[in-house]
Amino acid sequence: MTITPQHLIALLPLLIVGLTVVVVMLSIAWRRNHFLNATLSVIGLNAALVSLWFVGQAGAMDVTPLMRVDGFAMLYTGLVLLASLATCTFAYPWLEGYNDNQEEFYLLVLIASLGGILLANANHLAALFLGIELISLPLFGLIGYAFRQKRSLEASIKYTILSAAASSFLLFGMALVYAQSGNLSFEALGKSLGDGMLHEPLLLAGFGLMIVGLGFKLSLVPFHLWTPDVYQGAPAPVSTFLATASKIAIFGVVMRLFLYAPVGDSEAVRVVLGIIAFASIIFGNLMALSQTNIKRLLGYSSISHLGYLLVALIALQSGEMSMEAVGVYLAGYLFSSLGAFGVVSLMSSPFRGPDADSLYSYRGLFWHRPVLAAVMTVMMLSLAGIPMTLGFIGKFYVLAVGVQASLWWLVAAVVVGSAIGLYYYLRVAVSLYLHAPQQPGRDAPTNWQYSAGGIVVLISALLVLVLGVWPQPLISLVQLATPLM
């Protein structure tokens, strides 16, 4: 095939982030300078975000048989880039106190972002696998970045071994799907699956193995066992990336696969996904109830959030609103998670050993950092799905989609899960306003709101509130992000 200037414009975000990786590599080789490499990374990610406007002007197209650039890909690419940008911003003050190599952190985040962009544009099972590996491999290093901390190293080893096992399941599943259908492209799969082939045992086994692999990456029950330990052990900025960029990119590509190849038409697949969604919602929320570590709590809550999203995925064949629901929910989840993990990062910076992730560290925060406590409260209310926040709009969409598709037992699970979630989110929010302990632990810097990380956290809180009251701009944006059929 011939690569035209139009194709290059369509690939701009991928090319810009790739070029930034090379520039940062050369910069590290030439001279170690933490500020320079952090600045180069942030400039590259901002340039990639700006380039999405030019991609939109170029229109939707298939760049290669592996990649399709359309409104859907642009939305998910934008969300991944925002999460990567926030991760780099939170990491800078944290790394200031880190005595080992600081610069490689940005390199790993950029390479993982490349994987996220590839996943957002993937239109082929080979691109899906390449993207997942490209986002997972840098995470092995990022999770164990504070390798002198026992928990960080343990989390990295745990994630590496389990991730390798999940990837092998995913690859074997793809092989079985290919053996039965003879296709790897999403669209070609859709055409071949339309002939009553969905009942073939080999194909169902292939999709079953793929669900195991993807379920691990999305930390769905029962493939979730790594999640709380890894969230707790990883440095706070890495937990931010893990909770947002990697989940959004992988869910985006699964959404596209289900859209083109009507896998959800199979009753067996729908039942299995329904059970996984139900278990993720209930188990994730119940396990979060007893947590006293805020990163573990957010880890368990992310399991339940992916369960809510799975309800919209199961309802995908029932109506157009499912895609809108997923887009709005993921945007709300992104900003709420960035704010919550951003507060933990600010409290844990600069690096001084373990993060400030104990709930006790946040007790009475309001009395000496009132704005930071207010931001954390807004994020907890949004994650709980309280009205006037963006989280409520997303949860309302999911419930509407579930009702539209007559998934009554999953709608009941969402309602019960939200009620349980309200308890532990409010427990975090209330502890911020209790009497401060006699010997306060870690604290955010006095001028935190003037730092780049502080600005990101404040913008996230503002977006959660403004879009919670007036969600139309976000809904219009998500409606524009339609995939090329």
From Swiss-Prot:
GO molecular function: NADH dehydrogenase (ubiquinone) activity; NADH:ubiquinone reductase (non-electrogenic) activity; quinone binding
Biological role stated in the UniProt entry: NDH-1 shuttles electrons from NADH, via FMN and iron-sulfur (Fe-S) centers, to quinones in the respiratory chain. The immediate electron acceptor for the enzyme in this species is believed to be ubiquinone. Couples the redox reaction to proton translocation (for every two electrons transferred, four hydrogen ions are translocated across the cytoplasmic membrane), and thus conserves the redox energy in a proton gradient.
Primary enzyme class: translocase
Location, primary (coarse class): membrane
Family of the protein in this entry: Belongs to the complex I subunit 2 family.
InterPro entries: NADH-Q_OxRdtase_suN/2, ND/Mrp_TM
Membrane topology designation: Multi-pass membrane protein
Superkingdom of source: Bacteria
Descriptive protein name: NADH-quinone oxidoreductase subunit N
Signal peptide stretch: none
Enzyme Commission (EC) number: 7.1.1.-
Catalytic activity from the UniProt record: a quinone + NADH + 5 H(+)(in) = a quinol + NAD(+) + 4 H(+)(out)
Transmembrane spans: 8-28, 35-55, 71-91, 105-125, 127-147, 159-179, 203-223, 235-255, 271-291, 297-317, 326-346, 373-393, 408-430, 455-475
